[in-house]
């Protein structure tokens, strides 16, 4: 009896294990894992925020309030960068704005944790001083020449232009405010949502060089890679070393992703920050980064040239690179683009295994 009972228990255990394996297999069949990769400042985290807005319930009032200290840091840090840049370029501010400049330097000299706790909200008086600085001719000139002295976030003008609203006592961050915030991504962050009966896992990993060693831990069971490139940063240098061109770094990283790490995985290329690129190309020729480029300061020619540079990297003939021009802060644009991405992924899955019949 003891032997029979033991045998039956063993069979039950095996059955439970098999059922568990089958359940997990079916779960994975109904799950799409998108790995969001790209160099730093390419807009990956903004894409993740858009998925929460579009495919989840968006941000609650409490969640919006949590962004206020981040917005404060962005405003203060960005203005400090401009003031320091003025010093490097030998510029001066209007004497009437001296107190405002001192205020910025004092606040940003505090440790980040103290500033976040004590200055989670800027008051109206501080807002007026920041607004005065933003309209200062010297600060405006430094803004135009920012690429000469720093990697100033491209969202800086957005926050300065909105300073009155953001320092109101009743201020609650909007979707656009949240989308424009900049916090360096560290570690791995997941955004989960459903479209129909299919579960999506969007995995965002930090893009700075120090964060890329964490990418390997996310490579299992990837359905497709979404690779983000900032079109507008073709003339800027990396935050990490201030000597490597950002576009050339993106090309190098894309080569590793396409030809080494994900040879058999669909890759969707987001050529991001198209709005900023459209304006910049009018003033900064793409040939400064790519001397062989002869298309002049034409948006369509320049964006197509960059797209083709990435396409040419692919060494696997049977693998297509799907590309989209994107503006990560434009919710309507990302909604339309992601519909196309969804169709690409579903088609690939059907062709490969008939999972979503």
Curated annotation (Swiss-Prot):
GO cellular component: cytoplasm; cytosol; heterotrimeric G-protein complex; plasma membrane
Residue positions of covalent lipid attachment, annotated as S-palmitoyl cysteine: 4
Domain G-alpha: 30-356
Residue numbers spanned by region G4 motif: 268-275
Changes after translation: Ser-113 is transiently phosphorylated following stimulation with extracellular cAMP.
Cofactor annotation: Mg(2+)
Residue numbers binding GTP: 41-46, 154, 179, 185, 207, 272-273, 275, 328
G2 motif: annotated span: 177-185
Record region (G3 motif): 200-209
Any one GO molecular-function label of the UniProt entry: G protein activity
Induction: Expression is induced by cAMP pulses and during aggregation.
Protein keywords: GTP-binding, Hydrolase, Lipoprotein, Magnesium, Metal-binding, Myristate, Nucleotide-binding, Palmitate, Phosphoprotein, Transducer
Annotated Pfam families: G-alpha (PF00503)
Region (G1 motif): 33-46
Function per UniProt: Guanine nucleotide-binding proteins (G proteins) are involved as modulators or transducers in various transmembrane signaling systems. G alpha-2 is required for the early aggregation process and most of the known cAMP receptor-mediated responses. Interacts with downstream effector gflB, a Rap guanine nucleotide exchange factor, to regulate the balance between Ras and Rap signaling at the leading edge of chemotaxing cells.
Record-linked PANTHER family: GTP-BINDING PROTEIN ALPHA SUBUNIT, GUANINE NUCLEOTIDE-BINDING PROTEIN ALPHA-2 SUBUNIT
Similarity comment: Belongs to the G-alpha family.
Entry protein name: Guanine nucleotide-binding protein alpha-2 subunit
Lineage of producing organism: Eukaryota, Amoebozoa, Evosea, Eumycetozoa, Dictyostelia
Gene designation per UniProt: gpaB
């Amino acid at each position: 009896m003891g032997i029979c009972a033991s045998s039956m228990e063993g069979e039950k255990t095996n059955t439970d294990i098999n059922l568990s394996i089958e359940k997990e297999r079916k779960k994975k069949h109904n799950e799409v894992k998108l790995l969001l990769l790209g160099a730093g400042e390419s807009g990956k985290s903004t894409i993740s925020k858009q998925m929460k807005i579009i495919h989840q319930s968006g941000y609650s009032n409490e969640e919006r309030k949590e962004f206020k200290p981040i917005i404060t840091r962005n405003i203060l840090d960005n203005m400090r960068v401009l003031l320091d840049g003025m010093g490097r370029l030998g510029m001066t501010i209007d004497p009437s704005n001296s107190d405002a400049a001192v205020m910025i330097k004092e606040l940003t000299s505090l440790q980040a944790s103290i500033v976040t706790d004590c200055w989670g909200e800027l008051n109206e008086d501080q807002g007026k001083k920041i607004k005065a600085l933003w309209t200062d001719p010297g600060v405006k000139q430094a803004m135009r020449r920012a690429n000469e002295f720093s990697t100033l976030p491209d969202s800086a003008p957005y926050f300065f232009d909105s300073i009155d609203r953001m320092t109101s006592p009743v201020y609650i961050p909007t979707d656009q405010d949240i989308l424009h915030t900049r916090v360096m991504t560290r570690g791995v962050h997941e955004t989960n949502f459903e479209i129909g009966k299919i579960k999506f896992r969007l995995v965002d990993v930090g893009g700075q060089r120090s964060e890329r060693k964490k990418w390997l831990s996310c490579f299992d069971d990837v359905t497709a890679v979404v690779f983000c490139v900032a079109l507008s940063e073709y003339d800027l240098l990396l935050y990490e070393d201030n000597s490597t061109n950002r576009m050339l770094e993106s090309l190098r990283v894309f080569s590793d992703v396409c030809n080494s790490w994900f040879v058999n995985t669909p890759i969707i290329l987001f050529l991001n920050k198209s709005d900023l690129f459209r304006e910049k190309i009018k003033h900064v020729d793409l040939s400064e980064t790519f001397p062989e480029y002869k298309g002049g300061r034409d948006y369509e020619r320049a964006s197509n040239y960059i797209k083709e540079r990435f396409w040419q990297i692919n060494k696997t003939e049977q693998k297509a690179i799907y590309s989209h021009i994107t503006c990560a802060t434009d919710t309507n644009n990302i909604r339309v683009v992601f519909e196309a991405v969804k169709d690409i992924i579903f088609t690939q899955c059907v062709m490969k295994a008939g999972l979503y019949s």
